[in-house]
Regions:
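Membrane-embedded segments
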Residues: 1-85
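Second-shell loop/turn segments in exported
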Residues: 12-19, 45-49, 178-180, 223-226, ...
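Solvent-exposed, polar/charged alpha-helical surfaces in well-ordered, non-transmembrane soluble domains
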Residues: 27, 31, 61, 187-194, ...
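Helix C-cap/helix->beta junction micro-motif
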Residues: 33, 66, 197-199, 243
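Hydrophobic anchor at the start of a short beta-strand
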Residues: 41-43, 201, 245
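Residue-level recognition of beta-strand->loop/alpha-helix junctions
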Residues: 45-47, 205-207, 249-252
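Serine-dependent acyl-ester chemistry module
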Residues: 79-237, 255-256
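Catalytic His-Asp segment of secreted/periplasmic serine-dependent ester chemistry enzymes
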Residues: 210-287
Length: 287
């Protein structure tokens, strides 16, 4: 096997909103023809377009079966709020897998979490669950089309640019200063490192838009007030140092004009900047 396998997990910025497959982070890393440990670097995109650390941990657990040489976990503060962990459909509809992670690795999950979709006996039958089966077969057909065309999303000719002017609002998920580790799903992040085991994992704080518009002295962007994000970065540095994690903070590595319809969605040029920043870390991680 002459492939140095890199699995990239994250949100819609990794998945590639408004990007063609070759323009995504994984696509651009593959185009660079990097060589690590005498092998050709091959990056695999396991991004999924919702933001939740617990969702990412689920994907990490599935990725293990592909025996990656390196895992890159792209994340951002909005993946950490406690109330977001199980609300994403990928988690809400896979309670059994989440409970398995809780049992095996100590992932913190409430016993009575109401976000999980619980099916009754009728809903588990083929007739009662026919909508899900219809979706399943339709997606298999779509998959053939996506593979044949390389197109797996709608590319609008025009789109609304990411917001850069804001109200004078310092709020973030009802949290109050100072931000603490208890406010965030740190347990899910720790679980992710347990799940990958001996496989090296880069923890990357992904680039975000830094606005210079109205009230940008209060908010960096639509997602984050400055106070919250600044404290989050301090927490991430402290956590990584305490646990010996390889942490790469690229929060301000891409200029504001290289974002598209969101404060975390990059243009192809922005993705290229990100790939160039990450390439040296990939080359350092030979088994």
């Amino acid at each position: 096997d002459d492939e140095f396998r890199v699995v990239i997990v994250g949100d819609s910025s990794v998945w590639g909103t408004l990007l063609k497959p070759e323009e995504t982070l994984a696509g651009q890393l593959n185009a660079d023809n990097l060589n690590a440990c005498g092998k050709t670097v091959r990056a695999y995109n396991l991004g999924y377009p919702t933001i939740s650390l617990t969702k990412d941990v689920m994907l990490l657990s599935y990725a293990r079966q592909y025996d990656p040489d390196l895992v890159i976990l792209m994340t951002t503060l909005d993946a950490f709020p406690l109330e977001k962990q199980t609300s994403t459909p990928l988690v809400a509809n896979n309670e059994e897998k989440v409970r398995e992670l809780a049992t095996s690795y100590g992932l913190r999950v409430e016993a009575d979490d109401s976000n999980f979709e619980v099916k009754n006996f009728w809903q588990k039958t083929f007739v009662g669950d026919r909508r899900a089966w219809a979706d399943f077969f339709r997606l298999q057909i779509y998959g053939v089309m996506w593979s044949a065309t390389g197109i797996d999303q709608f590319y609008p000719a025009e789109y609304e640019k990411a917001q850069t002017d804001f109200e004078a609002d310092e709020s973030y998920h009802d949290l109050t200063a100072p931000l603490s580790e208890d406010d965030l799903a740190i347990n899910a992040l720790e679980t992710g490192f347990q799940v990958v085991g001996e496989t090296p994992m880069l923890l990357v704080n992904e680039p975000m838009l830094i606005s210079s518009g109205a009230n940008s002295d209060i908010r960096y962007n639509f997602f984050y007030p400055r106070w919250t994000y600044d404290e989050y970065r301090k927490i991430m540095y402290a956590l990584s140092e305490r646990n010996g994690w390889t942490y790469v903070d690229l929060w301000d590595s891409v200029p504001a004009n290289e974002f598209t319809n969101s404060a975390i969605h990059l243009t192809p040029v922005g993705e290229n900047m990100l790939a160039e920043n990450l390439a040296p870390y990939i080359l350092e991680n030979c088994k």
